[in-house]
Amino acid sequence: MTDSIIMIMSETLGVSIDANTSQSTCEKWDSLQHLHIVLALEEFFDLSFEPEEIATMKDVATIEQLIQQKIKN
């Protein structure tokens, strides 16, 4: 799953990222790109995020945890 998330985020941001990437370490990850990332992840994984969840999506690990929780439910 991590590879899929990284692929989606890399394509959306137009830069190479890894599992340690966060908003604070990626200059291209601004608020507009954040929304693009969320939409791409929702489409790829066929799920929806709540506004509160979107606000916590600040790094790859947190995003993966959120997606895993949603898939289990």
Annotate the PLM regions.
Residues 11-28, 44-56:
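Phosphopantetheine carrier-protein modules
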Residues 30-38:
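Amphipathic alpha-helical interaction surfaces in cytosolic regulatory modules
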Residues 1-17, 68-73:
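Thiotemplate assembly-line natural product biosynthesis machinery
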Residues 48-72:
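C-terminal structural segments of small proteins and small subunits
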